[in-house]
Amino acid sequence: MKTEIHPNYKAAKISCASCGTVYETRTSIGDINIEICSACHPFFTGKSKLVDTTGRVDKFKKKYKMQ
């Protein structure tokens, strides 16, 4: 590698604002704050909700008399 053309690669902490989990990694950016991480995101924790749209479809059809 050529010297003095690459950015400084240093240890950094990625901290989640939602749950407070801190991940340690190496990056050229520095410390990073994120809103949500895999430890608290509903998709990864298995607490995701299924949105039921059948009521919306029926309301639309009734509104425009499509039945």
From Swiss-Prot:
Keyword hit for Ribosomal protein: yes
Molecular function per GO: rRNA binding; structural constituent of ribosome
Annotated PROSITE patterns: RIBOSOMAL_L31
Gene Ontology biological process: translation
Database matches in InterPro entries: Ribosomal_bL28/bL31-like_sf, Ribosomal_bL31, Ribosomal_bL31_A, Ribosomal_bL31_sf
Entry GO terms, CC: ribonucleoprotein complex; ribosome
Give the record's keywords alphabetically.
Ribonucleoprotein, Ribosomal protein, RNA-binding, rRNA-binding
- The protein's role, per its UniProt record: Binds the 23S rRNA.
**What family is this?**
Belongs to the bacterial ribosomal protein bL31 family. Type A subfamily.
Supply the PANTHER family for this chain. Answer: 50S RIBOSOMAL PROTEIN L31, CHLOROPLASTIC, LARGE RIBOSOMAL SUBUNIT PROTEIN BL31C
The UniProt subunit note reads as follows:
Part of the 50S ribosomal subunit.
Protein name (record): Large ribosomal subunit protein bL31
Q: Per the UniProt entry, what species is this protein from, by scientific name?
A: Leptospira interrogans serogroup Icterohaemorrhagiae serovar Lai (strain 56601)
Lineage start: Bacteria, Pseudomonadati, Spirochaetota, Spirochaetia, Leptospirales
